[in-house]
UniProtKB/Swiss-Prot annotation:
An example Gene Ontology biological process: tRNA wobble position uridine thiolation
Localization annotation: Cytoplasm
Stretches assigned to coiled coil: none
One term under GO cellular component: cytoplasm
Function: Sulfur carrier protein which probably makes part of a sulfur-relay system.
Record-annotated active site: C19 (cysteine persulfide intermediate)
Main location: cytoplasm
InterPro entries, alphabetized: Sulphur_carrier_TusA, TusA-like, TusA-like_sf
Organism superkingdom: Bacteria
Record HAMAP family: Thiourid_synth_A
Similarity annotation: Belongs to the sulfur carrier protein TusA family.
Protein name per its UniProtKB record: Sulfur carrier protein TusA
Example of a GO MF term: sulfur carrier activity
Organism: Shewanella oneidensis (strain ATCC 700550 / JCM 31522 / CIP 106686 / LMG 19005 / NCIMB 14063 / MR-1)
Amino acid sequence: MNDVFSTAQHKLDALGLRCPEPVMMVRKTVRQMAQGETLLIIADDPATTRDIPSFCEFMDHTLIASETMQTPYQYLIKKGL
């Protein structure tokens, strides 16, 4: 695991879930987090490579890092406002 991903304050395992479940779980988890906290998302649905970055942009969260060259995919996001 890359060092940047190990800094996450929260972790969400979305392995085995298919669209739209991963993004719905991310949204629910982020709602319970404080502004500025980070979330590591681990997923294997190819749709997350498009959906997670779009979710972050739409909801004003920051996509700090992503690893999508191999599964499981990893995303590190920081909660915005």
